[in-house]
Amino acid sequence: MSENIAVVGSGAFGTALAAVIALAGRSAVTLVGRDPSLIADLKAERLHDAVLPGILLPDTLEFSAEADAITGASIVLFAMPSQAQADAARQYGPYLCKDAVVVTCAKGIERATGNLLTDMLERELPDHSIAVLSGPGFAADIAKGLPTAMAIAAADMETAERLAQAISGRTFRLYASNDRIGVQLGGALKNVLAIACGIVEGRGIGDSARAALIARGLAEMSRFVVAKGGQADTVRGLSGLGDLVLTATSHQSRNLRFGIALGRGEKTDPLQGALVEGAFAASVASRLAAELKVSMPITDAVSAIIDGKLDISEAIEQLMTRPITTE
């Protein structure tokens, strides 16, 4: 079935998604951005060297800087950062067609409320079905056509399977799910754990410590997901374990690099912190975990380090001297 698809957000991930969907050749795809000058350059040059250097964008991909460009789209992907999604919903909501499905592609939690992004978008766009795309996929890999698999979750499997069929391509495979909670929390919490792994690398503590963080972090993630109503199996899939392994081990990860800088004791740019999804998610997840009475010591430590309330050496000592327990 052919779909009309709009991708809102002309950063690296939005551009990569638009390109790979357009290359599949089954749907008309428009990349929508806010900067008319950038959109004009993309249309003329078919290159977005600022974020995807040297990657030629397909001739079939359309571009627009106008909000009404989404009017005819049956599927609209929101590919801007998590904290900008509410504003995007208000800006683009009036132009959505009646039956459009909105897919959030960000990996975060709404900072002001602690809401999941699907909850926030349902609040802002109550007449539309809301889905989430998440999993282990870097923008550059997707845009280069390197094999990538991610998860897409909707409230019902029929919608999730339709979206997976519409968005998947020869090198980009989506797996359908009806666990929006688990898919979203996996994407948000793995960013926090990636910062922790970066701190370990920056401190030179060793690969054994990184492996322990990944394993125990996955346990934290599972406890939190189940407490929020998600499924433990989702945590062991692409949007949980898969994304965690990728983000915690690859230097393409902004969250890992941020953690490395913290671990080395480097002064981090406040702007850099504002762009790191895990920096937002850490404090929100720590607060929510306390409310839910869920034990998340790694997340708590990352939140305290970022907020300047805990020294890294103290955090390591606290984690290693916690009461012995079963796995």
From Swiss-Prot:
Principal place of residence: cytoplasm
Enzyme class: oxidoreductase
One GO MF term attached to the UniProt entry: NAD binding
Catalyzed reactions: sn-glycerol 3-phosphate + NAD(+) = dihydroxyacetone phosphate + NADH + H(+); sn-glycerol 3-phosphate + NADP(+) = dihydroxyacetone phosphate + NADPH + H(+)
GO cellular component, one term: cytosol
Associated pathway: Membrane lipid metabolism; glycerophospholipid metabolism
Function of the molecule: Catalyzes the reduction of the glycolytic intermediate dihydroxyacetone phosphate (DHAP) to sn-glycerol 3-phosphate (G3P), the key precursor for phospholipid synthesis.
Protein known as: Glycerol-3-phosphate dehydrogenase [NAD(P)+]
Upper classification of the organism: Bacteria, Pseudomonadati, Pseudomonadota, Alphaproteobacteria, Hyphomicrobiales
Gene: gpsA
